[in-house]
Amino acid sequence: MDVRQSIHSAHAKTLDTQGLRNEFLVEKVFVADEYTMVYSHIDRIIVGGIMPVTKTVSVGGEVGKQLGVSYFLERRELGVINIGGAGTITVDGQCYEIGHREALYVGKGAKEVVFASIDTATPAKFYYNCAPAHTTYPTKKVTPDEVSPVTLGDNLTSNRRTINKYFVPDVLETCQLSMGLTELAPGNLWNTMPCHTHERRMEVYFYFNMDDDACVFHMMGQPQETRHIVMHNEQAVISPSWSIHSGVGTKAYTFIWGMVGENQVFDDMDHVAVKDLR
């Protein structure tokens, strides 16, 4: 488990390129036949990937000491979106087949969660966010047909994109975790511009569906103290409440966003005008 401490905005603005990457970038999300796990002190979110290839993968009691519990989801809820080939997630004996861009919400208290790929030639890639939970909501599969899609932006401003809301109150109940998938239209490069912050929530972006020769310049920092982190395919970045989170790519891309914090009101944002950015 990679533990990331929270950081004050006054400290963050003094960091150089490597310092920013050390604090906020999750460089390696998927490792064959393993799970990765980054624990952030910011709202206690856990972020990672699970890629079963030749065997099943589960998060066992080895994380209990670090989380102060007997098993992983004793006091947590889990959201998983599969960006790879078809796979299965077995929750306390109940097997769910999770295809490409399908998702599974797992409620607090699930003791055994096992991940597997159906075809080792095209393994599943389960990207997950995990957050503290105060009650148990039912485990539920979510398909692309069930999400709440919203198309925003314009080709003229190069930010035409479709936001697919997987884990939001309109789709299912969670304690605090919200997740979704945003896909840029061909030829569009900007996400979340004009940008915003949200004082009451933190957020993690996971960029994928990128060519090897492409990258995203992820913008972060306070609106008057902006910085950037160069992102490559299948990497994630942590965004504190005080930071903007926006990006521009050298080619179109897709990203998964996950939020935890005070509320689940999607539009609870503090908008920042482009003219006010520095």
Swiss-Prot record:
The family classification in the record reads: Belongs to the KduI family.
Q: Which CDD domains match?
A: cupin_KduI_C (cd20491), cupin_KduI_N (cd20294)
**Subunit:** Homohexamer.
**Domain of life, per lineage:** Bacteria
Any single Pfam family the record assigns to this protein = KduI
Pathway(s) of this molecule: Glycan metabolism; pectin degradation; 2-dehydro-3-deoxy-D-gluconate from pectin: step 4/5
Species assigned in the record: Escherichia coli (strain SMS-3-5 / SECEC)
Q: Does the keyword Zinc apply?
A: yes
Q: What EC number(s) does the entry state? A: 5.3.1.17
What remark does the entry make about the cofactor?
Binds 1 zinc ion per subunit.
Q: Kindly list the GO molecular function terms attached to this UniProt entry.
A: 4-deoxy-L-threo-5-hexosulose-uronate ketol-isomerase activity; zinc ion binding
Q: Which cofactor does it need?
A: Zn(2+)
InterPro entries in alphabetical order: KduI, KduI/IolB_isomerase, KduI_N, RmlC-like_jellyroll, RmlC_Cupin_sf
Q: What is this protein called?
A: 4-deoxy-L-threo-5-hexosulose-uronate ketol-isomerase
Q: Where does Zn(2+) bind?
A: H196, H198, E203, H245
